[in-house]
């Protein structure tokens, strides 16, 4: 990540088990599938990008003809039987949402997702439900312990009061 040697004892490395706490086994398969002969840097920021890439490939399955199916990594990861899945929100968005709404459980996340995408539920989108679980776990393990809060300074309090007054006039 920073051009330094990866070392778990330094805390800048990532094990397979840690990946599987925050991302699906299929996303790890995609990470390993791309450029298999090249050394890879395994760090936490790679997980959201790879999870989103994996679901992008799954979303393209329905549009693929037989020739382009072979070029889609999802086809190989699922041994020729991938499901075409399109998600209403990306994993990156879920991670951002988890940090903003202080997601302590899946229900908090689902309340926001259902407002954003009406009709989307854990039952209709089980893959999204798994991603929400990963996002909540990521928030609890990686974001919350490092989150620092501070009181607003005088200038910020003035701006926040002005914003509150402006919004109260709208509603």
Regions found by a protein language model. Give the residues of each.
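Basic, alpha-helical terminal appendages of large translation-related enzymes
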Residues: 115-171
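Catalytic adenosine-cofactor/nucleotide-binding cores of aminoacyl-tRNA synthetases and other
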Residues: 2-140
């Amino acid at each position: 990540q920073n051009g330094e040697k990866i070392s778990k004892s330094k805390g800048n490395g990532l094990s397979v088990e840690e990946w599987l706490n925050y991302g699906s086994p299929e996303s790890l398969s995609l990470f390993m599938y791309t450029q298999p002969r090249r050394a890879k840097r395994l760090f936490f920021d790679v997980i959201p990008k790879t999870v989103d890439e994996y679901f992008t490939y799954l979303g393209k399955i329905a549009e693929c003809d037989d020739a382009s199916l072979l070029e889609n990594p999802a086809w190989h990861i699922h041994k020729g039987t991938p499901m075409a899945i399109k998600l209403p929100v990306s994993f990156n968005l879920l991670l951002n949402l988890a940090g903003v709404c202080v997601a302590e459980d899946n229900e908090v996340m689902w309340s926001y997702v259902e407002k954003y995408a009406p009709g989307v539920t854990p039952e209709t989108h089980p893959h999204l439900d798994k991603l929400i679980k990963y996002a909540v776990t990521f928030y609890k393990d990686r974001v919350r312990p490092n989150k620092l809060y501070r009181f607003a300074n005088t200038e910020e309090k003035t701006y926040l009061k002005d914003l509150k007054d402006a919004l109260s006039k709208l509603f």
